């Protein structure tokens, strides 16, 4: 599996997990209803499935590396979906996390 495919799987996993959590949030906190919650739960389940498609056999390594993608992806999601404006520390932290992803997954 190529690095590009692995990164694509990480991005897909992030969309499913962050999107799923956002749907649950919208359903409960924003009172949009249980349909939103149900769609969120389905999305979160699909996230778990996508995570299993990574090439490395070590669950801990995959989830640790994915954590960096999740941090950066969550900030990006907030910008696009909620109008959040990250400050320089948000951006710096996300970039540090992405460097960590590279070291954990692809430095070998």
Curated annotation (Swiss-Prot):
Localization, UniProt: Cell membrane
Domain of life: Bacteria
Record's bilayer topology term: Multi-pass membrane protein
UniProt keywords, alphabetically: Cell membrane, Membrane, Transmembrane, Transmembrane helix
Lipid biosynthesis among keywords: no
Residues annotated as transmembrane: 8-28, 33-53, 62-82, 87-107
Pfam families assigned: UPF0060
InterPro entries referenced in this protein's UniProt entry, alphabetically: UPF0060 (IPR003844)
Record carries keyword Membrane: yes
GO-annotated cellular components: plasma membrane
Entries under PANTHER family matching the protein: UPF0060 MEMBRANE PROTEIN YNFA
Similarity comment text for this entry: Belongs to the UPF0060 family.
Name the UniProt record assigns to this protein: UPF0060 membrane protein RER_49640
Source organism (scientific name): Rhodococcus erythropolis (strain PR4 / NBRC 100887)
